[in-house]
Regions:
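Glycosyltransferases and closely related glycan-assembly transferases
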Residues: 124-128, 144-156
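Conserved N-terminal ligand/cofactor-binding loop architecture of enzyme catalytic domains
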Residues: 22, 26-120, 161-188
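Glycine-rich, histidine-containing beta strand-loop boundary motifs that form or position
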Residues: 35, 135-136, 143, 158-162
Length: 188
């Protein structure tokens, strides 16, 4: 049985709640709901999701340690990113690519990255996710999730809106950290 994580943040609840229900109904897939924060958790509960839901922000608060990160941990992160991205990103490149990290000190950005790495490692051990659905890898916590999926031979997916036929919009399913689109690949 495949395990799919639906990582709910902001408006993704609107999309992922019915997706989760459809996957549950189809059978053969275990759906795990991950809420970004307490607001998303409340929305999931209001939508009738009653099972256990991990709250990402609570877990990061538990795992984050202020102050300089141990150089050994930084070397581990660097090697993990290089391997998972097939050489496209090292730790420094990933830190510089996060659109939110310019607001933080280097110690804070490295500490958060280590907390994200520990979270996704624990989460993957607990649930053995074959796929994570969330949003593009423009923030470190998404990039780290994609790297953990790659390490397990799994997939990191995210939907984007694209102009469809006529005046409508469709969702395209993208994968990985490099903006690969299986939908387009199949059609080409």
């Amino acid at each position: 049985m495949k395990t799919i994580v639906l990582f709910h943040r902001l408006e993704l609840n609107t999309l992922f709640v019915p997706v989760g229900r459809a996957l549950d109904s189809a059978g053969g897939v275990r759906v795990v709901h991950l809420a970004y924060g307490s607001e998303e958790l409340a929305q999931l509960r209001a939508a009738g999701i009653t099972g256990p839901v991990t709250v990402f922000k609570d877990e990061i608060r538990r795992l984050y340690r202020p102050g300089p990160v141990d150089p050994g941990d930084l070397a581990e992160l660097d090697a993990f990113f290089l391997k998972g991205s097939k050489g496209a990103f090292n730790l420094n490149a990933a830190l510089q690519s996060d659109r939110g990290f310019p607001l933080l000190s280097l110690d804070e950005a490295q500490g958060l990255t280590l907390a994200y790495h520990r979270f996704w490692g624990e989460f993957q051990q607990r649930y053995g996710a074959d796929a994570v659905l969330h949003e593009p890898c423009t923030l470190m916590f998404n990039f780290v999730a994609a790297m953990h999926c790659a390490a397990r031979g799994g997939d990191y997916f995210y939907p984007i809106m694209a102009q469809g036929p006529g005046k409508g919009f469709n969702h395209l399913l993208m994968s990985g950290f490099d903006f690969t689109c299986p939908d387009l690949d199949r059609r080409l």
